[in-house]
Design a protein with these regions (language model features):
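Active-site-proximal alpha-helix that buttresses catalytic centers in soluble enzyme cores
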Residues: 1-246
Length: 246
């Protein structure tokens, strides 16, 4: 498994790589620049895994506020960022139900629907985690989904969890099997939105946009449409400012 996973990941990254680099890094850098211009204060970005590293970036800032771009809190993401912070550094723990974040998500989906029409089914896919110890995370994911559905005035939607690996039980239902089941039951066109990812990345572009789409089509579906993440949408940059100032 250890021999195969790096090669498999490299192949997947090749499918979504841009001339500017990793989509996640590109979008995050742009968000930081736009927020800096909007707030007229120093704004820097860092990566939990990779460069620029969190600790090295913190050394360049006075009285920093850290905003992990994980809307829903979990021990495996947000908490690991907190573990790296020196004493006294402030951090936003979560923003899964922040009105500006929900409004940005809703505006993003509406913009896509205005341009491309609305699919017959709406599926909200969040990053999965092992089920044990993830009660808070799951609750916040489902709360985000409910608030987004309310903002969109959608009565029927599905919540699923992706990115599972290994043999332990993860949060259910799983995204790809759910899509196959939908296709087998006659669903022809499904819209997928990933509210837990604020930037398009490997998990959205490849895992949903390529692999899950293929699984859906192979099972008899006609069209799986991936709604882009928030990326550099003006509503999201505004939401980031409101989250930071709260």
């Amino acid at each position: 498994m250890l021999r195969k996973r790096p090669e498999a990941s490299a192949e997947k990254y090749q499918q979504v790589w841009t001339p500017e680099g990793s989509p996640l890094a590109v979008h995050t850098a742009r968000q930081a620049r736009l927020l800096r211009e909007r707030m007229a204060i120093p704004v820097a970005y860092a990566m939990r895994y990779g460069e620029p590293a969190i600790r090295s970036v913190l050394e360049t800032l006075d009285e920093p506020l850290v905003v992990p771009l994980y809307p829903q809190y979990s021990e495996s993401t947000t908490a690991t960022v907190a573990d790296l912070l020196p004493p006294g550094v402030r951090m936003v723990e979560q923003f899964h139900d922040h009105p500006a974040y929900i409004a940005a998500l809703a505006a993003n989906v509406r913009r896509y629907w205005d341009a491309h029409g609305r699919g017959a089914r709406l599926l909200m896919s969040f990053h999965g985690l092992p089920k044990r110890g993830s009660e808070r995370y799951e609750g916040e994911c489902r709360a985000t989904a409910a608030l987004l559905a309310q903002a969109l005035k959608v009565d029927s939607y599905l919540v699923t969890f992706q990115s599972r690996f290994g043999y332990a039980e993860w949060l259910r239902p799983y995204t790809e099997p759910t899509l196959r089941e939908l296709a087998a039951k006659g669903a022809q066109r499904v819209d997928v939105v990933c509210p837990g990812f604020v930037s398009d990345c490997l998990e959205t572009l490849e895992e949903i946009g390529i692999a899950a789409r293929k699984a859906f089509l192979d099972a008899g579906g006609r069209e799986l449409r991936l709604v882009p993440c928030l990326n550099e949408s003006p509503e999201w940059i505004s939401a980031l400012e409101q989250i930071a100032r709260a």
